[in-house]
């Protein structure tokens, strides 16, 4: 019987929590009781000492000081003083010994309760996410894709004309590709969920409970030692008191840690209630495309997607394996240290080892989680690898429907097409091209001439802006804009003329727009005519249009964007690829979740407000913001190479040192520009830099950035969102951010670069990292790092901010190092 086999159910978890609360209350009662005993012994010793002082005047018997009575009394008073000293020493021994150790035990017990609850909640959340939420999401998407595929197939089969049939077939092939790819994701997700379920109920949860039982039993043994030490110190020599103490000692001796929780287990233990494991939902295949449950689809449509998935899973497996080895080494090291300390520690000092025992149990639990992740990735890799090995060097199987379509094409039709490449080959070429760039973006749109664009897309159309704001926008004679009249369904042409704004209502009748004279089918055509002909708007006013005043270039409408696939996820929401409808510019679109509170949405837009003012080749470029409706978007240039950290980890092995020097030089140039603008980034790291297809590095993610006139920003919030391992000591200790603190972060970025994406301060927690740095320690030199670059790193990590180099000096130094390096 044990926690791991009897308390795996939610009821068992509740019972454990109640037990921990009850035991903590008992320990607190013991501590108060012992403290009262110490206080009582001190007071009693003080009273005895006071009695001795009162008789120190040497009152003697009438027969003189040499009489037996006087000598006896003197001996009594002297021994009373000795007794007071003994009792006082006992009180101090109780305070520094059992009472102090009991306080440490209570503190460790509270920490154990907190750690256990956090780990149990984490395990349950991860199980729910992997086993339920992710699977349900995949199933919902699966059903949608099955419906889309079925509908596309029906339209394809019903199409009669060649043109319609080709178009329908193209849509059907696309739907098949999406369905097959998602089917593969669902198969991999189910396999991962099954393994996570297995690890959760076989290893991770039982391991957590076994660790808890081990620590509880160890603490029970320590409590036994504390009570025995207390009784030994407080024991007196009188027979009646000794008899009581023998009974108390016997009671303390009856404590047996290994049997301490048997009664608790008998009362609350139960058979583990393991819920059924997830399986492939075969109802999804009722209208499917001859798909097999639990089997990956490998054909001409999915070959490249399977290859890319295999590569990705293999890379993730390598990282997971490295993590497992690291955690195994940590567990072994802690076991060795604990064994050594146990040999050199008195049994009654075992309470001092509790924190290390808890560290060991936490490390073992972390190892179990890492092994679960490794097994999931291993299983997914084996599924993908076996499928690829079955294919061998041959061609992937054709999709049956498309294969039939090949045979149905008549020779006459082929001749009529003039030897054109078969449709399937064109489609295969199209699909293979999908995977060439880092991200896929929507296809180009057909561009529309400016004059043919609708009114709301015209740069000089400002919408329903207040009339008072018009006077601020129009500054020179002939400046104009078109706006919507407030409170009326009509459009107004506002023009600056003779030093004051003039407002002309655009007349509309018979679907024509005019001021005086000819009418035009649209307002853009009317404005284009007035601007090109330079004729007065009205004969009476003589006003002529010279220059259109554009609306804020950063303002975009949601309709201005064509969203593509999701390419990432940020702190505030998803990130998508996309295009601008106006000119087909590829963009990255950051979205803000609608459920976020207003203050977080304001922080989301903070990045856009910062970037509006900047224009530098090494700073990611802002294109616009969409704030007219939910969700809010920030639109930025699309940097195809992805983030710098992933780039280092995947491409670093083939990069030359000179290339790395060029890339960190780009980062330094961008930060020098920000420094000149009094901008403090506050979150400079490899993960927040982007890489173009030509290996140009750009600074990104300005969500934590601030602009301060004196170049210093004082943060008032806590450290919850602060990247501790990248942040300077003065920022962590006093909330003082400056360009000098960004220089410290740049030193960590240099270290990440030349360690090819390694994590700084591995195996250290955030608190341990702070203590490590405060003691004067710094990161070691990476293997590939030139000596001159490491010296620059050390300058960036000077403890005093004033001793760190500026970004201007860093740029010059990196440029010099790059010129010297061959």
Curated annotation (Swiss-Prot):
Q: How is it modified after translation?
A: Autophosphorylated on Tyr-713 in response to FGF2. Phosphorylated by LYN in response to FCER1 activation. Phosphorylated by HCK.
MF-aspect GO terms: ATP binding; immunoglobulin receptor binding; microtubule binding; non-membrane spanning protein tyrosine kinase activity; phosphatidylinositol binding; protein kinase activity; protein tyrosine kinase activity
Highest taxon of source: Eukaryota
Q: Where does ATP bind?
A: 567-575, 590
Q: What is its EC number?
A: 2.7.10.2
- For the keyword tRNA-binding, the answer is no
| Catalytic residues as annotated in Swiss-Prot or TrEMBL | 683 (proton acceptor)
Q: Which InterPro entries match?
A: AH/BAR_dom_sf, F_BAR, FCH_dom, Fes/Fps/Fer_SH2, Kinase-like_dom_sf, Non-receptor_tyrosine_kinases, Prot_kinase_dom, Protein_kinase_ATP_BS
Q: Name a biological process GO annotation.
A: regulation of cell adhesion
What is the protein's quaternary organization?
Answer: Homooligomer. Interacts with BCR. Interacts (when activated, via coiled coil domain) with TRIM28. Interacts (via SH2 domain) with phosphorylated EZR, MS4A2/FCER1B and HCLS1/HS1. Interacts with phosphorylated KIT. Interacts with FLT3. Interacts (via F-BAR domain) with soluble tubulin. Interacts (via SH2 domain) with microtubules.
Entry domain remark = The coiled coil domains are important for regulating the kinase activity. They mediate homooligomerization and probably also interaction with other proteins. The N-terminal region including the first coiled coil domain mediates interaction with phosphoinositide-containing membranes.
Q: What else is noted?
A: In a BRAF V600E-driven, PTEN deficient and FES deficient melanoma model, tumor growth is accelerated due to an increased proliferation of melanoma cells.
Function in brief: Tyrosine-protein kinase that acts downstream of cell surface receptors and plays a role in the regulation of the actin cytoskeleton, microtubule assembly, cell attachment and cell spreading. Plays a role in FCER1 (high affinity immunoglobulin epsilon receptor)-mediated signaling in mast cells. Acts down-stream of the activated FCER1 receptor and the mast/stem cell growth factor receptor KIT. Plays a role in the regulation of mast cell degranulation. Plays a role in the regulation of cell differentiation and promotes neurite outgrowth in response to NGF signaling.
Full protein name: Tyrosine-protein kinase Fes/Fps
Kindly list the organism's lineage. Answer: Eukaryota, Metazoa, Chordata, Craniata, Vertebrata
Q: Which gene encodes it?
A: Fes
């Amino acid at each position: 019987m044990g926690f791991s086999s009897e308390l795996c159910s939610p009821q068992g978890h509740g019972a454990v929590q109640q037990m921990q609360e009850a035991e903590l209350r008992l320990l607190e009662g013991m501590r108060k009781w012992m403290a009262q005993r110490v206080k009582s012994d001190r007071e009693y010793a003080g009273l005895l000492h006071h009695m001795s002082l009162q008789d120190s005047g040497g009152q003697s018997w009438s027969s003189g000081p040499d009489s037996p009575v006087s000598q006896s009394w003197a001996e009594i008073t002297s021994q009373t003083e000795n007794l007071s000293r003994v009792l006082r020493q006992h009180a101090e021994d109780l305070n520094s010994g059992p009472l102090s150790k009991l306080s440490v035990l209570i503190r460790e017990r509270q920490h154990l309760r907190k750690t256990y609850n956090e780990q149990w909640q984490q395990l349950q959340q991860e199980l729910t996410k992997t086993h339920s939420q992710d699977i349900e999401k995949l199933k919902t998407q699966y059903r949608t894709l099955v419906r889309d595929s079925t509908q596309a197939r029906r339209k394809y089969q019903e199409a009669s004309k060649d043109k319609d049939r080709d178009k329908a077939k193209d849509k059907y092939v696309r739907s098949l590709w999406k369905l097959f790819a998602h089917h593969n994701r669902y198969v991999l997700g189910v396999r991962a969920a099954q393994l996570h379920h297995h690890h959760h109920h076989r290893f991770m949860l039982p391991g957590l409970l076994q660790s808890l039982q081990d620590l509880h039993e160890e603490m029970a043994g320590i409590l036994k030692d504390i009570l025995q030490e207390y009784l030994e110190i407080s024991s007196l020599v009188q027979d009646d008191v000794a008899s009581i103490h023998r009974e108390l000692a016997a009671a303390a001796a009856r404590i047996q840690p290994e049997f301490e929780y048997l009664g608790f287990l008998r009362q609350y233990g139960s058979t583990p209630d393991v819920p059924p494991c997830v399986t492939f939902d075969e109802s999804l295949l009722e209208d499917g495309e001859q798909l097999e449950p639990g089997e990956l689809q490998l054909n001409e449509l999915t070959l490249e997607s399977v290859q890319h998935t295999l590569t990705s899973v293999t890379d993730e497996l390598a990282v997971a394996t490295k993590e497992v080895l690291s955690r195994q080494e940590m567990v072994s090291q802690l076991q060795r240290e604990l064994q050594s300390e146990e040999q050199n520690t008195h049994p009654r000092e075992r309470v001092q080892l509790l924190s290390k025992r808890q560290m060991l149990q936490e490390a073992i639990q972390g190892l179990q989680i890492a092994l679960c992740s490794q097994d999931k990735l291993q299983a997914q890799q084996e599924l993908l690898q076996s499928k690829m090995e079955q294919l061998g060097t041959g061609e992937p199987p054709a999709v049956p429907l498309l294969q039939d379509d090949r045979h149905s094409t008549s020779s006459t039709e082929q001749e009529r097409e003039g030897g054109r490449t078969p449709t399937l080959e064109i489609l295969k070429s199209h699909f293979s091209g999908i995977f060439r760039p880092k991200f896929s973006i929507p296809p180009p749109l057909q561009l529309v001439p400016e004059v043919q664009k609708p009114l709301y897309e015209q740069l000089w159309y400002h919408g329903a802006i207040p009339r008072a704001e018009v006077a601020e926008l129009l500054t020179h004679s002939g400046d104009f804009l078109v706006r919507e009249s407030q409170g009326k369904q009509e459009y107004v042409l506002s023009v600056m003329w003779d030093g004051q704004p003039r407002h002309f209502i655009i007349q509309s009748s018979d679907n024509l727009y005019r001021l005086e004279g000819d009418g035009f089918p649209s307002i853009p055509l009317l404005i284009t005519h007035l601007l090109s002909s330079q004729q007065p708007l009205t004969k009476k006013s003589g006003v002529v249009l010279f220059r259109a005043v554009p609306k804020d270039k950063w303002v975009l409408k949601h309709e201005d964007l064509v969203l593509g696939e999701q390419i990432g996820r940020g702190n505030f929401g998803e990130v998508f690829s996309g295009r601008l409808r106006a000119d087909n510019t590829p963009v990255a679109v950051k979205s803000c979740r609608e459920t976020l509170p207003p203050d977080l949405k304001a922080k989301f837009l903070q990045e856009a407000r910062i970037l509006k003012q900047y224009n530098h080749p090494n700073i990611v470029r802002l294109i616009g913001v969409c704030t007219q409706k939910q969700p809010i978007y920030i639109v930025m240039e699309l940097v195809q190479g992805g983030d710098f950290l992933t780039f280092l980890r995947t491409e670093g092995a083939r990069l030359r040192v000179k290339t790395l020097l060029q890339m960190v030089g780009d980062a330094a140039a961008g930060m020098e520009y920000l420094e000149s603008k009094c901008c403090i980034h506050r979150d400079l790291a490899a993960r927040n830099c982007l890489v173009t297809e030509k290996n140009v590095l750009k600074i990104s993610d300005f969500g934590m950035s601030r602009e301060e006139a004196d170049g210093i920003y004082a943060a008032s919030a806590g450290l919850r969102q602060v990247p501790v391992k990248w942040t300077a000591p003065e920022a962590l200790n006093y909330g003082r951010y400056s360009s000098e603190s960004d220089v410290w972060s740049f030193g960590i970025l240099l270290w990440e670069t030349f360690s090819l994406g390694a994590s700084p301060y591995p195996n250290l927690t955030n608190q341990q990292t702070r203590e490590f740095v405060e003691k004067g320690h710094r990161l070691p030199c990476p293997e590939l790092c030139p000596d001159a670059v490491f010296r620059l790193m050390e300058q960036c990590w000077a403890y005093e901010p004033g001793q760190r180099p500026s970004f201007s000096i860093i740029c010059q130094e990196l440029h010099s190092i790059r010129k010297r390096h061959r």
